[in-house]
């Protein structure tokens, strides 16, 4: 068995990452569930689908409307999500969500209905400055990581603010700090870039270094800030 990329030059350049090329091996993993399981006397037991569905129906009926919740994978299809919310709302509950990694929802009203990069994927490699905040981009989005790498190899500056140092295949400037300090670090970098309206965020040497790198590369204001999954999971 082999996995090949779909021919879509503007998105993937007919390229596929190792992560995605070999992901099919999970089909044969010993850890993969192949049948429903029910916990009895503290131990998981494999059962037939009919038995599992009957138990689920009984548990849902026994629970009150406000005690039913549903978490849907964000990679589920539109049809799967529609059916999931139809089922949950039919049971009298509105507790359904797909934001499984997000912890802070205070800015939801300001978020776009359809989040996107703000530019075509192909233009990412043309950026003179890229700032990644809370992102292990090679693991999260290999296709974007490839574009960022091309930008770096073309002379663009790539800087990262993360709770740990990530493994990249191109030059970068990385600021590593505590997870709960990422917001303060970002504010300090912004202040070092000339934004004085950020209160008490005082830039240190590391913040100044990132600011200088971004300033030097982004003289034509061609830059982008990318927020990753690590940042989304932080409060």
Region spans (language model):
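Catalytic alpha/large subunits of respiratory electron-transfer oxidoreductases
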Residues: 1-235
């Amino acid at each position: 068995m082999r996995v090949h990329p779909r021919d879509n030059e503007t998105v993937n350049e007919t390229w596929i990452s190792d992560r995605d090329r070999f992901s099919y091996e999970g089909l044969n993993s010993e850890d993969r569930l192949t049948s429903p399981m029910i916990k009895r006397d503290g131990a998981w037991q494999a059962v037939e689908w009919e038995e599992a569905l009957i138990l689920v129906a009984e548990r849902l009926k026994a629970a009150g409307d406000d005690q039913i919740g549903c978490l849907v994978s964000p990679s589920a299809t539109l049809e799967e999500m529609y059916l999931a919310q139809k089922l949950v709302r039919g049971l009298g509950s509105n507790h359904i969500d797909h934001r499984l990694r997000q912890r802070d929802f205070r800015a939801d009203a300001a978020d776009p209905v359809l989040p996107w990069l703000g530019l075509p994927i192909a233009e990412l490699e043309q950026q003179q400055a890229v700032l990644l905040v809370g992102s292990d981009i090679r693991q999260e989005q290999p296709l974007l990581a490839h574009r960022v790498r091309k930008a770096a190899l073309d002379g663009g500056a790539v800087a990262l603010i993360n709770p740990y140092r990530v493994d990249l295949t191109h030059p970068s400037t990385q600021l590593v700090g505590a997870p709960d300090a990422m917001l303060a670090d970002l504010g300090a970098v912004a202040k070092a870039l000339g934004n004085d309206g950020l209160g008490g965020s005082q830039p240190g040497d590391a913040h100044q270094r990132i600011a200088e790198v971004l300033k030097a590369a982004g003289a034509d204001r061609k830059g982008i800030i990318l927020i990753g999954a690590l940042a989304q999971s932080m409060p």
